[in-house]
Amino acid sequence: MAFVRIDTGSEVRTLMQSATISGASSVGTPSSTLNLEIPRDVLTPSASISVSLLEMSGTGSDLARFPRDGGELALDALQNGGIDVVVVPIRYDADGSGRMPDTSEGAMNALRDQLLAMWPVSDVRLRVRESVSTSTTVAPTSGQAWGSLLDGVGNLRQSDRAAGSEYYLGLFAPAASFREFCGRGCIAGIAPLNQGNYQSQRYGLALGYGDEDNRFSAIHELGHAHGRPHAPCGGVSGSEPGYPHAGGATGVWGYDFRNDRLYDPSTKDFMGYCEPQWVSDFAYLRLHQRVVSVAGGSTLSWRLAPHHVFRVAPFTAPSWTGLVEERVTDASDGELTMMKARDRFGRDLGWVGARRVETSLPGFASLLIPDVEDAAFFETPSGQIYRVASSGESALHPNPPDDSNVR
């Protein structure tokens, strides 16, 4: 029998579990081990734990306890505030179908539960926004179309005046089924690779067919929006340089509380393209650090100012997509792209430093350029022009009230 003693600082809780075990124990064989589920309410920052084993027959051993000195181990449990996800249903009008993604209660509960199972959070506050529509045709591998819709989600986040902690996740269904759309390969999602923790870049876009593959895609894109690059598996581009486990493996045992499933350390990290997937210790820690930064309030002290956003894509001129409120950067943020601001007559308004935010799709990025009064365009030292438009052309449009999909 196993006894687990947990001292929360205000109470002592004892948990017990018994089993008959013969032979050596192995982590990957649950029947060979004793397993207890610890209630979340006792995992406080001040909690400490001790474990002892008692042989039901026989004399037992004084060494069958942890810590062996008879003391307690401080858990150093951390609270990080959880995450806020706003799902944006996008009605697909390009083929005349008016097709909606699956944002049913069951699908959203499954997405929330999978985030809770994989990410270092104890709370996922997920809501479904009113739907919008698009007439943009999205082919399975059309990076330009995906980039256009992604910009629309980002602009929507800005026009909604979303809370700083909210991550917008656009979902859409460009074909009748995932198999029909992706049978010969496809882009399944795209998001800014938000390594700079820019408030305006907390959004992403994914297919919304409601199955487990699509949930993994959505969570993968939320990972990018939290600053996570690709794990090195499956021919990804721009993989994490310091990823510690060969082949993009998780490197540690994983556990899914929803079904008591264990994931072998050879399982692949969810930020790669290989299967099966779970979350690595490496990604888990870094996601926690980002969630703490966002939800813990460290971003509240940022000084915000208007920034122009330009979409950069292969084989096309930079396009202005709108204005966002973003933090004022300085040299400590890393490399800046210096640009000359000019008015509509070409007169010099001074230098500004722009930030480039890559997306998960190679070659596609956003450029954040601080606004300058009367600026009509910005010019790089090499002569490339970034022209400000009076208004951006969005790929997303509001739906009539009866098409809304709110929960």
Stretch-by-stretch model annotation:
Residues 57-94, 386-407:
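Short beta-strand elements
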Residues 1-14, 111-112, 116, 121, ...:
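Extended low-complexity, serine/threonine- and proline-enriched intrinsically disordered segments
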